[in-house]
Amino acid sequence: MDSNSPKSLYKFDVVHINIRGVLANNDNLAEYLQELNYPEIITLNETKLAPEKRVTVNNYECVSRRETHRSYGSMILVRSDIGNVVEINNIKTRFMNDEIIGIEILETALHPGLKVFTMYNPPNKVPNADIFRYISNLSGKVILSGDFNCKNLSWGSTKTDRLGEDLQDLINENDLYILNDSSKTRCDPFSGKEEALDLILCNHENLSLFRGFWVGPPIGSDHFPIHSRQQFRSDPNPTSREKERRIESTDWKKFEQILNSSTSLAAPKTPTEADLVAENLTREITKAFQDSCPLQYKRQPYRTAFTPEIKAMVKEKRKLRRLKNAAMERNDITHVRHIMTKINRLGNDIKGLQKLERKHQLEKHCEQLSREVNPKKFFQTFKKVANPIINSEPTPSSFQIISDEFGNEAKTDQEKSDLFANRLEKVHQEPSYRGFNAEWKKSVDDHTTNNPGTFLVDPHSEYAVPEDGDDSPLLGEVTTQEIRYNLAKCKTKSAVGLDGISYGLLKKLPETYLKKIAGFLTICLRLGHFPSSWKHAKTILIPKPGKDSKQAKNHRPISLLSCLGKILERILADRLSKHLEQNNLFAKSQSGFRAKRMTTEQLLRLSEECHNAFKTQKVTAALFLDAEAAFDKCWHNGIRYKLRKNLKLPNRFIRIISSFLTDRTLQVFYRGCWSRKVGLQAGTPQGSPLSPLIYLIFVNDLPQEIVDLGLSLSQYADDTALWTAAYTVAFGISKLQKGLNFLEGWCRRWRVKLNGDKSKLLIISRLREKTSETPCLQLFDDIIKPVPTARFLGVEFDSRLNFAPHIQDINGRANKRLNVLRVLSRGGATPSTLTKLYGMYIRPLFEYGSAAFLAAPKNQLEKIQKTQNEAIRVSLRLPSYIRINLMHEAASMPKLQDRLTDLNKKLLLTIKQNNEHIEHLASDRSANSISPNIISPLDILL
């Protein structure tokens, strides 16, 4: 587009408002911004917002805010569609005693760059000269807005005071310019006297862009909003509303006809040909979906609908505002006051009707819940009410600067995308540590290099020569039934990979086309090759709750892989898991990702052994280990070595697993920006169904000497725990150290780095042992000291084993969820609906891991029983004087202790069949007991 064309002129508005309480005037602010067609930047003074409070304004994000005094407060809002905006953080520390904040819009092809500041200068205070010198020394275009509380005839005040003279001098000395046009910016509500106190200033570089200034009507404050308009020569190319294809709108008959009429695929003979066939399959399915499903506009986020009556009142309110503006231009103060009275009354009426409408919506949801029979739809309806109440975690601003551990910073969305990608590339590198065994690494690498036919396949080699193990069930023909079985375990609406093919689409494939896919997957198995296009991931980043989202490490990467590729991964994982189980190749200590194995058995085992130690007046020393980036840093050659040496799998199956790990890539997608493609040299792919099983194989051969020492070993995926019972703490620690030395040797060989800072040592004892100093453990170069509590598989164990910290935690979370029941109860939900919600939404918090704390002190279990009592009262709307037994009878609900006991008795039957440790504890639980008064979980369950 020609830069001189009128179409290339792009307006950019900055609006400053002294809001006098942003929460109180939030609705008025939203209406006003809508009337203005959503200006780009809003600066606010006197927000009067407590630091812990948050405020949301539709279509805007809060980039910067500050509260130095409860009566002050400043905030800058930026329209959500404006990218490349960062907060200027150093100004808060530079001027700690002043109310000033700032943001920067970075220079792009669409915007010349702009720095915007707002400050609030309290009455009778001389403006800080250092602020103006700082603003003057900045490069680029700068705007400073604020309520300066200074009067000067030069900007429209009725008089000039001492503060106004000082401010005028500062403006002149620092080459700043006033954009105001002498309009009054405040009207005293009592005397009607008008003054000009709010200003918008700019530097010389920005003056050439200035196109206009005007004053708007007050919105809940005695100050008038002031507007400044700049104009740039660029084309912002605003994005139109996006379109999408919805799977439920697909013409499935047409979809099947297109796929059935597709040409048959030539059977690939080499890995290179297999890659081409995989890409062709993706193209055919994608084109069939596009031709049979129309494009539709993306659905807008759910909003509470306004009634026609409310819309008419909002329209009338806007009309009154226009009349008030006209009266202000005529200086008709009496008429202005009369209209303002009408506006305020109408605003209160609108708020009242909105409140009634929200109540009506709640009643509608409650009625829908009472009628809904389908559990899935029941929970979807419930989440519409629950999510706004429970999810209080603030959404990170898109404008914040993100930094990584290496000191790199990213401001724009593209920079952030590349920053995340670079970090993931560094994480997925072959682990190196000065203590690792270099000779063993060379031996394993040489073994892999000297046996290329076992681990790798030539891209151009044909499958012709039979090999040992070709008749193994692992390499059997893939059937359509096997594909359907694995598809049935997948969520229909699961996120899709780069190819855009979902599980829902694959479930609708016709049988003839499914046979084509089954034949291709069989050939991949025989070739020992995993198609390259299925090894490329789209990675998105989700901030970890409760962590600082400005740190790149506090974002969790979610890899979206091809659903077609994940079907092959599921088939490989299913076959390999059955092979390992049938041949008893899993270590007895491993419970993670195995059929009929669960976290409960490991929690019960630890709790039971600790209670048995109490009975014999022993202490338990437990070590909970944390492997650094466990899944992300698995040594690939180490995995290949173990597949061949430890499991003796067929060569072709080893090759396809090796191919699955080799040459994997990802691209980070962050707020519409793609990073460069990065390679992953180590680790298992996140989000893959096969990755957990590969990790289990990698850690399946922990040293047997650990168990021979008399230590108990528990593995659940990457959660590893060691513990032992002893008569003294020192002896228990010494046994743990010996076992840890064996484990450390294994880690040095297999290049696993244990994190000493995150590993926890817990001494569990009810004895009053007098020791001058508790011994510590040494792990590599780290010293591990005892801690009062440690979390294991989601349950908080403490040194006295009374589970007070854990019960306090789950009780706190349950009480938050109980608020949802209270809201629904007020909305008219039926008692049966509320009790049903308690059973599916709150009680599971108490049930998980309950086998471990079943023998907790009575006063601790009573705490969660009280929460259940309150839930029943809320559900049945019962007064506080009704007896607890009668309440439970009315709700047809057992006491929580009885419920947990019955539940764990059923679990114990399954556990005893699969875990010999629990079976042994059950048979010998009373042997050598010195303290028979101590009750263990198995004493309650058996």
Model feature map: region roles:
Residues M1-G352, G565, V707, S712, ...:
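A shared catalytic/ligand-binding motif for oxyanion handling
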Residues E67, S154-G164, R186-G192, P218-G220, ...:
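Conserved, non-catalytic sequence blocks in retroelement Pol enzymes and Pol-derived host proteins
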Residues F132-S145, L572-Q590, K615, P692-Y727:
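Active-site palm subdomain of RNA-directed nucleic acid polymerases
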Residues G146-N149, H223, G497, H536-T539, ...:
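Catalytic palm active-site di-aspartate
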Residues N174, A196-L197, H204, R229-D235, ...:
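Basic/polar low-complexity segments
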Residues V277-N280, F436, G500-I501, K535-K538, ...:
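Short amphipathic alpha-helical interface segments
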Residues Y297-K298, R303-F306, A587, Y716-A717, ...:
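Non-catalytic, peripheral interaction segments enriched in hydrophobic/basic residues
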Residues L424, G469-P685, T724:
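Conserved pre-catalytic core of RNA-dependent polymerases
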